[in-house]
Curated annotation (Swiss-Prot):
The chain crosses the membrane at residues 4-24, 33-53. HAMAP family: UPF0391. This is UPF0391 membrane protein lpg2415. Keywords: Cell membrane, Membrane, Transmembrane, Transmembrane helix. GO terms for cellular component: plasma membrane. It is a multi-pass membrane protein. Belongs to the UPF0391 family. Its main location: membrane. InterPro entries: DUF1328. Pfam families: DUF1328 (PF07043). It is found in: Cell membrane.
């Protein structure tokens, strides 16, 4: 999940750069929203990843 948050963050940054340079001025507002949305998602997922630890292994007991 953290992988996808990073991918979408990069896409939002690239879209923002194109939008601010005038190539796609209509996409500027959308790029701003996406940028901040994915920054928040990145921070939340990073905190969950750091605080979550590793889950305990599941032990299957066969009768």
């Amino acid at each position: 999940m953290l992988y996808w948050a990073l991918i979408f963050l990069i896409v939002a940054i690239v879209a923002g750069l194109f939008g601010f340079r005038g190539v796609a001025s209509a996409a500027t507002g959308i790029a701003k929203v996406l940028f901040f949305l994915f920054i928040v998602m990145f921070i939340v997922l990073l905190v969950f990843s750091l605080l979550g630890g590793t889950p305990e292994p599941v032990v299957i007991v066969k009768p």
